[in-house]
Amino acid sequence: MSEETKEEIKNEKVDEEVTEELTEEALEDIVEEEINELDEAQKLATEWENKFLRVSAEMQNVQRRGNEERLQLIKYRSQDLAKKILSSLDNLERALAVEGLTDDVKKGLEMVQESLISALKEEGVEEVSYESFDHNIHMAVQTVPADDEHPADSIVQVFQKGYQLHERLLRPAMVVVAQ
């Protein structure tokens, strides 16, 4: 081989090595760029996933609250009607207390009263307890001194009955309380 041919082969080898080094550096740069882009894409995907999870949880909460409100509306649907019927029930009670009613009239009034009470009970309306004074369900309209027969905080007399629908108070009982 001639000197020139040897020199050409040597130059080709050097060119190949330089090209190989450049290609390796370029590949490393490209790989690094791709890794950075992938990291950004993963961050973006994680961010969108978190947003999706938050929105999904919020939707579940909205549905749950809507269901709870619907159940409350169903549970207390008869509240306004019950409040209006209570005054009629009071009037029936007053009418039954009148002296001189004939037995037929009295029996008719009692039947109407029982019918109203039964209808209210079916809807969940119940009379409040009168065992001892509870400011949550009773309204003290008068107090009397406590004695042996009526200890302190006991209810001496009920002026007007109180009612509740499930656990919600419709009307407090108006009572006389021993102090």
From Swiss-Prot:
It comes from the Bacteria. GO terms for cellular component: cell surface; cytoplasm. Residues 1-20 are annotated as: Disordered. GO terms for biological process: protein folding. GO terms for molecular function: adenyl-nucleotide exchange factor activity; mannan binding; protein homodimerization activity; protein-folding chaperone binding; unfolded protein binding. Keywords: Chaperone, Cytoplasm, Stress response. InterPro entries: GrpE, GrpE_coiled_coil, GrpE_head. Pfam families: GrpE. It is found in: Cytoplasm. Participates actively in the response to hyperosmotic and heat shock by preventing the aggregation of stress-denatured proteins, in association with DnaK and GrpE. It is the nucleotide exchange factor for DnaK and may function as a thermosensor. Unfolded proteins bind initially to DnaJ; upon interaction with the DnaJ-bound protein, DnaK hydrolyzes its bound ATP, resulting in the formation of a stable complex. GrpE releases ADP from DnaK; ATP binding to DnaK triggers the release of the substrate protein, thus completing the reaction cycle. Homodimer. Belongs to the GrpE family. PANTHER family: GRPE PROTEIN, GRPE PROTEIN HOMOLOG, MITOCHONDRIAL. This is Protein GrpE. The gene is grpE.
